[in-house]
Design a protein with these regions (language model features):
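Anion (oxyanion) recognition and catalysis
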Residues: 72
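Short glycine-rich phosphate-binding loop at a beta-alpha junction
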Residues: 52-63
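Long, charge-rich intrinsically disordered scaffolds of nucleic-acid metabolism proteins
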Residues: 79-164
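Short, glycine/acidic-enriched loop or turn micro-motifs at the edges of active sites
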Residues: 17, 61, 85
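Nucleic-acid-processing active sites and adjacent nucleic-acid-binding tracks
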Residues: 25-54
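Acidic active-site catalytic centers that drive phospho-/nucleotidyl reactions
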Residues: 14, 58, 100-103
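Gly/Thr-rich phosphate-binding beta-strand-loop-beta motif of the actin/hexokinase/Hsp70
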Residues: 2-25, 107
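Short hydrophobic/aromatic-enriched beta-strand-loop microsegments
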Residues: 31-34, 75-83
Length: 164
């Protein structure tokens, strides 16, 4: 069935460590798949059947990347959305309840109403450099935290710890 001629289809994807919750609006289709290569492949096949206007997924700090790469490979129009914008949208429409299904529905509703600009995938080198910078910043933060902890230790203990 070609649903695209009848209405604009928007897909909301709530990403979790172990599963993806997917809601297709306005068709009221909800399903979950494991956040694995096979699960993502199955989700992409199902989503493509409905010819969506956009697929919106919240930026979750890397958990969403395999799904984004699959969307890009499948030539699906996708948006990596700022979680704060989705949270503010939820507040604006008065949605307070929270679970995985409702989050996926909310993201699809956000996609339909706000129609955020599609995301373009950065080159592999840019993504790699960004990942390295992020990891460096994490390590620097941890190093600062350890230095601060070392300063408040009793002298007899801190003197036995090698400085870095």
């Amino acid at each position: 069935m070609n649903t695209n001629t009848l209405q604009n289809i928007n897909v909301g994807v709530d990403t979790g460590k172990s599963q993806l919750d997917i809601y297709i609006r306005p068709l009221d289709i909800y399903f979950t798949v494991p956040n694995t290569d096979k699960g993502i492949t199955d989700a992409i096949k199902t989503i493509k059947k409905h010819k969506p206007q956009r697929v919106v997924i919240e930026a979750t700090g890397r958990l969403e990347m395999p799904f984004i790469l699959a969307c890009d490979k499948a030539k699906l129009p996708y948006v990596v959305a700022n979680p704060l914008r989705i949270k503010r949208f939820a507040e604006a429409i008065g949605q307070r309840a929270k679970n995985d299904r409702l989050d996926a529905e909310l993201i699809a509703h956000y996609a339909e109403r706000v129609q955020p600009e599609l995301t373009k995938l950065k080159s592999e080198n840019i993504r790699l450099m960004s990942d390295l910078v992020t990891r460096r910043n994490q390590l620097l933060t941890m190093q600062t935290m350890e230095r601060n902890r070392l300063q408040i230790l009793p002298k007899n203990i801190s003197s036995t710890i090698t400085r870095f």
